[in-house]
Structures are given as structure tokens and as C-alpha cells.
Amino acid sequence: MKKWMAAVFVMMLMLCFGGIENVKAAEPKVYQFDFGSGSMEPGYIGVRASDRYDRSKGYGFQTPENMRDVAASGAGVKSDAVQFLAYGTKSNNTFNVDLPNGLYEVKVTLGNTARASVAAEGVFQVINMTGDGAEDTFQIPVTDGQLNLLVTEGKAGTAFTLSALKIKKLSDQPVTNRTIYVGGDSTVCNYYPLNSSKQAGWGQMLPHYIDKHTFQVRNMASGGQIARGFRNDGQLEAILKYIKPGDYFMLQLGINDTNPKHKESEAEFKEVMRDMIRQVKAKGADVILSTPQGRATDFTSEGIHSSVNRWYRASILALAEEEKTYLIDLNVLSSAYFTSIGPERTLGLYMDGDTLHPNRAGADALARLAVQELKRQGIAGF
């Protein structure tokens, strides 16, 4: 009798866990999806644009009629993709995966795209990935038993495509690790490939100087951004969804805000920045304001680099004092460094023919100066 019961038990286990295509069956710690109509790579679950979400499988597209299989120019999982024909952070045209509640690491591999962002759970997760086959990784807590993700703008009028997803469970607790969120413009944002791009923002290089066992860095900066846009267009919303006590929000804006085409006065800039500071502090997190560095050519005839009157710097200094935030006067710190190395070497830290945007070495130097200043001030965690 005992042997018969044991045999029945084994058969039940086989029925429950036998289906490799059912992501819910064995509740693996890692889920890998290969999107598109091409051949499926080993170790991945193949997903076509027509695959509608099915509770019995535990994955699929919410509205497959708004998806399309497309080719991609890479190899392996990067050889094909799916295109999102409907998009937006609030769109229901999502790829859904049933997951036990907890904290997950999600690696996203795009198909062919000029510039696209990744959204999940109704907010941006990665901003403006560029180039064919671009890859990035982010942490996300799952609290309702399902991850809902899509690829979205990006650059209007271009294709938003997804080649592969790798989802890895980190913890049973649906809370992000301690995080430094970064806001800013093209001198701060990420460029792709992250580990080898010629151009870089200092937010991209920040992890080189941060203890990864203490913090993760989430860079939500984007090229061309102004304070009003960062607050109103979804980037601040994404930060406010997850930021918590013990986290930091590093914010550097002002360069594009001074451009007359944006019709943003210095007074408006200051009040929008103040509003963002207060919203973040209401979540129990700390704010670190940073003043933008100057141009490579801001040298006097005596060889002194100085740009203290650029980019609404005075308003940023005043805000730090009025709102009791931390401050990195990166404008002055970088000028002192540029003066020490001279005009020629300073120019070598910027993109060719461009006196505003740092190259990879320049962004690395700015990130190093920023973290050195935080350590000098004795700010917790640095």
C-alpha cells in the first residue's frame, strides 16, 4: 500500500513539474525569454508576437494584436525581436510574466532601435537605450504576482523592439536594495553599450566609485532634459514609486534650462527643482544637488578654468541652503581639476569638436570628483 501511494505521489509530481514551457510549474529562480519568430536559443522560452497571455503557461502578451514579429541584426537571441505597436508607460500592451512576489533583477535586450525606454508596473525603468541590441539591467519588486513590461518611447517615430528578457529572483522580500537615483541631462545620462561607449555621462560612471554592496545606482537622466520635463514627463514619477528612507536622489539640471527655446525662467527652474526636492524628501529619502560643470574652453588668459556664472548655479546653491539638501558644487570642483591639468588635457576629456559633453574619461573624472566630495562631507554610505 505504501509503495502504491509513493508511486501515485511521484506521478503527481511529474504532472506538476513536467512542462518546461510552463514558467509557473517549477518556480525557477531564473526565467529567460527569446522573442520573435526565429529559432529559439537553448535555455530560453520562445515567445512570438501572437502569444497571448495564458494563465496556464504563466506568460504572454496582454494584447498580441498590438505586437509584431520583426527581424534584428544581431546573433543568437539578438537575431529577431518583437515590436510594440502600442506603447506608453500606462499602456496595457505589456508582456506579462507570473512571478512569486519578491525582488527581481531584469536584464533587457532590445532589437534594432534608435532610442527606446523600458517601462514596467506603469513607470519608466530604463530611460533612452540606444543602438541595436542594447542591453541594460534593473531591479524591480513584484508585489501582485505578475510583472508587466513593455518597450516604449524613446524617440517618436522609431520602432520599439524587444529581443530577450532574463528575469532573476534576488529575494523573497519585494523591496529594492538601497539605491542612489540620479536625475539630469546629457552630461549625466547613460550611453550604450554601457561598458564601452565613447560618450558617457557621469551618472553612468558613478557605480565605479560606489560600494555595490551598499548601493545600486539607477540613472534616470536623459539627454536634453530640463527641470520641468524631468518632473512632468515620468522620470520623477518612477523615482517616487520606489524611493525610500536610506536612498539618495542626486539631481543635476540647469544646462538646458538656460536655453531660451524651453521658455523656463530661472525663477521657474528654481521652484520646479524645489518641488521635486520636497516630493523626494516626503518619501524619507535624502537629496543631493549638483551644479553642472562648465565647458572645456572656460579658461581665462591666465590658464584658470572658471564657469561659476553658468547654468543657474546660484539658484542651485540657494536651493541647497533653503531646502537643507546635500550639495556637490561640481562646477567649482571640476574647474579646479581642469585648471590643474591645463586646457589641452581638459579638452581631451570632452567629445571631439564638442566643448560641453564629456567623453568616457571625462565622465569618469566627474563621477570621481563627485564621490570624493560626498566622502569628504562624511555623508552616510559613501
Curated annotation (Swiss-Prot):
GO molecular function terms attached to this record: hydrolase activity
Secretion signal, residue range per the UniProt entry: 1-25
InterPro entries: AGA-YXIM_GBD (IPR049033), Galactose-bd-like_sf (IPR008979), RhgT-like (IPR037459), SGNH_hydro (IPR013830), SGNH_hydro_sf (IPR036514)
Keywords: Hydrolase, Signal
Active-site feature positions: S186, D354, H357
Name of the top EC class for this enzyme: hydrolase
Entry's EC annotation: 3.1.-.-
Top-rank taxon: Bacteria
Family according to the record: Belongs to the 'GDSL' lipolytic enzyme family.
Protein name: Uncharacterized esterase YxiM
Annotated gene: yxiM
